[in-house]
Amino acid sequence: MGGDGTLLGVGRKSAPYGTPILGINLGTLGFLTAEEKNHAEYAIDKVLAGDYKMEKRMMLQATIATDMERIEGILALNDICITRGLLYKILEFNIYVNEEYVDTLRADGVIICTPTGSTAYNLSAGGPVLKADAQIIAITPISAHTLTSRSIVVSADDVVTVEINPREEADFTVSADGQDAW
């Protein structure tokens, strides 16, 4: 019970166990939750009676690798974002898909999102809305410093690598669903 933020956090924590989630909205938006709080008892009764439809949503798994450390197993239901830190310096990203160079972006950040996350930060950054059950990922620049930088859509089976230009002293943050950050 909670809002979309609660559901995102529970989704990341329960994903390794394959535990289904029933979201009851107590927050303000409730885009991801199945029911409103005034229908909670009814929704729970339906689930207990076996009268429900389960939606499977894809998740992202990320690894952060720097010269200093390697953090693996980062999960996200909505998105993984790499954004500039406290310094107001634009970042330069090299984007690779399956180890093949795709593009260089100069931007405030980059969003890698699932179809679930495509209607969140990705949409606000001008990215595409993806069909909820599609097995695809969008890569969207945040405030790109060029007119030609646009979102890239790839298969969920593809491995996306974002490399921050090593020539820069980059101050950046990596976040999962806007909640956990490194």
Which positions does each model-derived feature cover?
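Gly/Ser/Thr-rich active-site loops/lids in small-molecule metabolic enzymes
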Residues: 104-107, 112-148
